[in-house]
Structures are given as structure tokens and as C-alpha cells.
Amino acid sequence: MRPSVITVAVLFVQSTWASFAFGNPMSMRNKAHTNDLVNSKGKPLVGRFLHITDMHPDIYYEKGSTVDHYCHSYDHNSDDTPLGKSKVGYLSPGPGYECDSSPALIDKTLEWLKEHQDDVLGGIDFILWTGDNSRHDNDNHFPRTQSEILASNEDLVNKMIEAFPDVPIVSAIGNNDIYPHNIMEAGPSSMTRQLAGAWDALIPYEERHTFEKGSYYLCDVIPDKLAAISINTLYLSNKNAAVDGCPDDNLDEPGSLFMRWFKIQLEAYRLKGMKVWLLGHIPPTRGQWYEDCYTSFTDLLYEFRDIIVGQLYGHMNINHFVFLEFDKLPVDTESYGIKSAQPKYVKSLIDAQYAELPTFPENLTEEFLNGTVGNYSLATVGGSIIPEMFPTFRVYEYNISDIANQLDDREELTEITSFNWETLEEQSQSDYEIDKKKKKKKKNNKKKKKNKRKNIKPGPLGPAYVPSLFTPISFKQYFLNTSNYMDATKDTEISYELLYTSKDSPYNMPDLTVPEYMRLAKRIATCDKPEDPHQFKLQSGDQNTFRISKKKKPSICPIAYTYLWHAYIGSISDFED
């Protein structure tokens, strides 16, 4: 019997690092000890990082066009030209329309970030960028092409690097970053190779082969201490007709092969004593992922809860969070549409998941934290730059106070090697044959056990659960009120403003651990904290103060209303059924 994939990875200790690897650990370690408190580009750490997503630049956006035509200019002699429709502005059409981002919005946003990343944002250690770097394929008059998509990606990558030259940027592929959208076959392919070329400046040299194979990769953002794994959620998405989920008995499926690769990387990072952020585009919710992909993924989240710091996604354009529970399928929520930005989705999430979370005892016990809270992991979905709502991004603060004290504890860590795709596929195929035989035996056994809990031994609770090194402490949500820039020109200077923070009322979160998010979710669902139901202030300034009419009693309580208002970046204020 041949060893398993994980065993093979460990047996490669003391050999040289192959192409399917983390890179040379000795060179990274030497660099880390030169100046321990720096990111992977040598910049001193400040304890903050940026999450940005769904920029959707549109080269065909044109000032003076109409929203009925997706902000594209048609032939004025065409019968398709609407009469009496309002014209869109230079920067955006304002919130509520299905237009992608104007070149001006992208350029001015990145210019603002470049200019104010230190004085306003307080400095950035690394960036997690969760995809959709091309426009939507929603206008038959302007069909997308593969060359346009690749050019859009390469252009945006170059602009991001220009804005953040000393900040490591890790990006994840979006469903609109490929041609045709949503559909992606197993790699290597022309699409994966050309996308690797467009993203060349982001992908570590030693990860290039991996990316060409599956369009996912990994990258150290703090050398030898903190990494980010970019997930290709297209291989896990049930909207991708070119794949068939993540069956554990068919390694021809790219989703199954990804899960094997993913587990190997987590195992190796654990052995190196490192922590990991996960980022992807399509969030793991019902109706988005294949169920077997969701199940395999949550199994790994549970098993490696000691090293996974958190997960960030995009795609849905609304700020919210969901919980993934080990050994349970995702909750059933109402579908959403980008056209209407349906508040029903988040409201159904509150009812179906938040309300059903376990109630915390007055005195927390280790048993409750390990046995109950530890079954849950948190996925945060970010608001977008695309101006369908107000453009937005989030800056996280995370704990680096103990980083220097923990360096000496890992001096003698074993150097783990990895291996190339040929080795992975060979060993995985062997495991596949073994698994097939085991499953055949089980099928022939008439005695079946019902509801048997999976035999997975999890790690201890890590920084996602217990405040410690790299635990996210708080966040600040910034937004651009495009309604104030309808008359903007190329000379207009824009200003992103602070919308709210995780420490603001009514959230009052001491940190961003899973237990604190569970408490918040329960408060949102049960209206645990009484507030004035007729008036509440979301942020200083008349434009962000909303009053609920006393004549009409709201169907949702103020804390839930505030959460919904923030989810839709202040662009929607009516959440009544």
C-alpha cells in the first residue's frame, strides 16, 4: 500500500523545494531575520490590511449615455436608443443601476488609495483582492472577448501595483475574469496560461506552474509567519457547467484535485508554524457551490481551525457574513439578483442562520468553545467598487503585538518540502484507487450507520477563535457617495469617507473572532439590544441619518436595520417587505 498524499509531503523533508511549493524556506527565513517585522516586500508592519473586490472596469462606459444601455453609447440613429432618459455622469450613474465602473472611477479610486493609504488608512501591510477585474457580459451590442478580459486584468494588476509598490497583493479569480463567464475547464488551458501571464506580477515564480494548472496559488504576505491562499472558486461553483463538483472518487475533476492540493498546503503551513488567510470570489453559500465541494471545504476548515485566520470573498456586492458549520449543509436562503440588490437575501440569512445559532451561556466554558463554537467558521463577503451601490472597501486591523516574541520559538522548525504536479497526480491516483476499493466494500455491506459524525480530529482553536497573534481586531468601512459627484469632471478630486467601524454602536465588537460574530449575529436576529425604534444615527452627517416614521411600525428592529443598511453600503433605506 502506497502512502497517502499527506504522508508523501512529509516524507519529502530535507529535499529541495519543487515547483509546486512555497518557495525556498531558507531564503525566506534569512530575509525574515534581517528585519523580522516586515511584510514580504520588506515594508515595516503596521497591523492593517485591505480587502477590495469587484472593480469591474468598463472601457465602453461613456458619459452622456443612458442606464438603459448599461452606460454604453449606442448609435443615435438606432431604434434601440431610448428617448427622454437621463444621461450618466463622468464618474458614475449614481447608485441603483446595472452599470459597471467607469475608467474614471477606477483611476480616481486607486489614485485616492495611493495618496491616502498612510495618512487616512494608517498604512497597509498586504492586500486581499477577491476578483472580477473585467466588465459584465450583459450587453449584446458590446460582446466581451477573451483578449479584452485578459487586457482588463493585466491593466488593473499594473495599476494596483503602481498604487501599492511595497505592498504584497494576493488576488483571486472571479467568474467574470474568464471567457465565457462562469465556465472554466480544467487546466492547463489557453485561458489559465494567458491569465497567468496577465497576473504575472502577482504570482510568485514558484507558483506559476500551479496557477497554470488550476488558477489558484499561495503567497507569503509576512515571510515565514502569515500566508494567503487564493482559491479558484470557479471549480467549486455549481454555475460552472464544465465541472462536476468535488467527488472524492474522481480526481479528473479539478475541484477534487484542488481539495487534495489545499489540504497538503494547510498541512505544510501547520508544520511550518504559520497562519493562513483564505480568499476567493464566489462565497461558499447554498446555491453557489456544489454540495460536495462545500462539504469537503468545511471539513478542512474544521480540521485546520488552528491555522486559518479567516476567509474573504466578493461576488455578491453586499457587505455581510455567513457561518459555515462542520458536518452540516449550508442554510437555505432566498436567491438574490444584482439588478434589485434584494434585501430579502440578507433578511432570509438572518432568519435562517443567525437566529438558529446556539445561545451563549452566561459563563463560557472550554467545552462550549471547543465543542460548539469550534464547529463554526466565518466567511466575510465584501462590498464592491462597482457603482451599482456606493463603491466601498474595507481596512482590517489585526494583532501583531506578539509577533517578535514568537520568532525564537520556531528556530528549529522542520523545513517542509512540496512537490510538482506529476508527483501529486501520481499519488492522488493511487489514493483514488484505494478509496474506490474501500467504497466498493462499504456498498456491499448491508449494514448502514445513519448520521455518523465524521472522524476528523481538529486542531486547537486558533486566532480566528481566540485573540492571539494575527487575530483580526477591527475593521473600518470606507465608501464613496457617488450621488455627490454627478457633475464630476476629469479634474474633480474624490474623497472616500468612513461609513462605519466594527467598534461603532450598535455593533460594539471587541474583536472579530468567530465567537464575537456569533454573538453579534444572535443580537441582529433577536433584537437583543433595545434601541429607539423611531430614530437612530448611523454616522454623523445629515445624509446618513435615517428616521423611521412613527406612523408605520418597522418590521425589523433597529440593529437589524442598521446591519442591512450597512450591507447595502447606505444605498438602500427601505427594507420593508
Curated annotation (Swiss-Prot):
An annotated Gene Ontology molecular function: exopolyphosphatase activity
Annotated GO biological process: energy reserve metabolic process; polyphosphate catabolic process
GO cellular component: cytoplasm; fungal-type vacuole; fungal-type vacuole membrane
A Pfam family of this chain: Metallophos
Residue intervals on the Vacuolar side: 24-577
Region Disordered, annotated ranges: 430-460
EC number: 3.6.1.10
Described function: Catalyzes the hydrolysis of inorganic polyphosphate (polyP) chains of many hundreds of phosphate residues into shorter lengths.
Protein's UniProt name: Endopolyphosphatase
Species of provenance: Schizosaccharomyces pombe (strain 972 / ATCC 24843) (Fission yeast)
Record lineage: Eukaryota, Fungi, Dikarya, Ascomycota, Taphrinomycotina
